[in-house]
Amino acid sequence: MAAELPPYTHVPGITPHPIRDPAGHAYGKAIPRCPKPTIADWQSCWPLKEGRTLFEAGYYWEAHETWELAWATAGRHGPIADLIKGLIKLAAAGVKLYENQPIGVERHARRAADLFDIARQELGDTALGYSIPALIGIANDTAIKPPERSALPPGTPAPLLSLAKAHA
């Protein structure tokens, strides 16, 4: 499913909730299912690719929600689900950047690093199009020294975090 980027990125308590609020950018939109992601055929699970696109553009809440679809389809448990949950946690750290909550950024980024490490123990160094050691590094760097929060108006996406170094 290829999607246009939303007109804003959701910041809880500030912008309209994308799904629940009639003014939300995804209100009333049907969400297609995706096949269960596997190591061999992960690209057929559209939320994995779309989540990456949203994340790279600074739409962290939307990436989080999109990756949750893949996580649920993956069964919520096991190494593939752990890797996806790590991506979800890293996106949550991005949301906390927008909310100016440094403790939340650190907590979510550290949990992401832990989940990536757990996944790497079973999946090896590369899975779902990512270098898992690079993901661990990105998450740890975010926890230790988060990027400066953008001075843009709330809801304006800013790519403060990037997964580019982890693309495999």
Q: Which stretches of residues belong to each language-model region?
A:
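Residue-level recognition of tetratricopeptide repeat
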Residues: R52, L87, A92-G94
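Residues that mark the junctions of alpha-helical repeat units in TPR/alpha-solenoid scaffolds
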Residues: Q43-S44, G78-K85
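Short acidic alpha-helical/loop segments enriched in Asp/Glu that coordinate divalent cations
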Residues: H64-W67, I80-L83, I103
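Generic structural signal for well-ordered, non-membrane alpha-helices
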Residues: W61, E65-E68, I88-A91, R110, ...
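TPR/TPR-like (Sel1-like) alpha-helical repeat modules
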Residues: Q101-R120
